[in-house]
Swiss-Prot record:
Protein name: tRNA N6-adenosine threonylcarbamoyltransferase
Classification via HAMAP family: TsaD (MF_01445)
InterPro entries according to UniProt: ATPase_NBD, Gcp-like_dom, KAE1/TsaD, TsaD
PANTHER family assigned to the protein according to its UniProt record, in alphabetical order: TRNA N6-ADENOSINE THREONYLCARBAMOYLTRANSFERASE, TRNA N6-ADENOSINE THREONYLCARBAMOYLTRANSFERASE, MITOCHONDRIAL
Entry's family note: Belongs to the KAE1 / TsaD family.
One GO term (biological process): tRNA threonylcarbamoyladenosine modification
Keyword ATP-binding: no
Amino acid sequence: MNVIGIESSCDDTAIAIVNSNREIIANVVISQYTEHLPYSGVVPEIAARAHLKNLQYAMKETLNQAKINFTDIDVIAATSGPGLIGGIIVGSVFGQAIACALGKDFIAVNHLEGHILAVRLNENISFPYLVLLVSGGHCQFIAVLGVGKYKILGQTIDDAVGEAFDKTARLLKLGYPGGPIIEKLASKGDPHKYSLPLSMTKKSGCDLSFSGLKTAVKQLIFSIESLSEKVICDICASFQYTVVQILLCRSINAIKLFESYCSNNFKINRKNYFVISGGVAANQYLRQEIFNLANTYGYCGVAPPSNLCTDNAAMIAWAGIERLNANLFSSNFVPRAKWSVEEL
């Protein structure tokens, strides 16, 4: 079975073809980097127009990569939320039009579910498992009991991790997107040079907060008269270290909540998995620290490959396959900007 996946929820136009044997036959991503760079962030209207321009080319390139045509396609899956509504509508309607023309099923996919299930495209891990989903717009600890069966154990009460990275990069005039730039500079800096607040780490539960950290970084930057390359590297290292320490601290509580929740609702596996996914999970320092923590608590730390952590259509196609296999889909779905995984 061959499934086309379409992803357009933010600033990357992506189309992929994945089959039911867990093979990525084609995977095309068209970046909108140059369109948004002058604004140091994503402009929704510009993003939607770029998706409209890029989708037809991306589809043609995907079919060329796969060396197949539309008659070999069985199902169309497209991100239908959450995210920037303009881009979501463009991608979802594009997918529905193709499905209608081919007489094939259309599956509306939750973007976050794509991140949650992406690890199973490569690892084929069993349910249940714990996910730390860290991206530009979301930061959540999620108990994954099965396809469409999710419990949010904790989440950010204000800003997402990726947003904090981008904001810090803007303050330092480093460019966009901020995550990869800060990670690179942090490797050259001293992570203990500047002390930054470990927000909410003393509280129970596993909710998170990054607004205080953003404010502290802003105050630190404005207090330094000359931002030399060494100083910038030290700020990046201290910021990244603090983010990771916050996530590690809250992960310990998340593991305890996950085990408690599963013991009441599900038979937990002998081998437990702690998955980190989402765009920020491409950060190798964060990934390794989470793996180390998972191992300490008897879990196997896993993550999708870096190219499946950032927004991509292969994870959307795979989520479509998972939903099709579970018979959990409806072609009649209205795209939405907000859509919790607990509503699936």
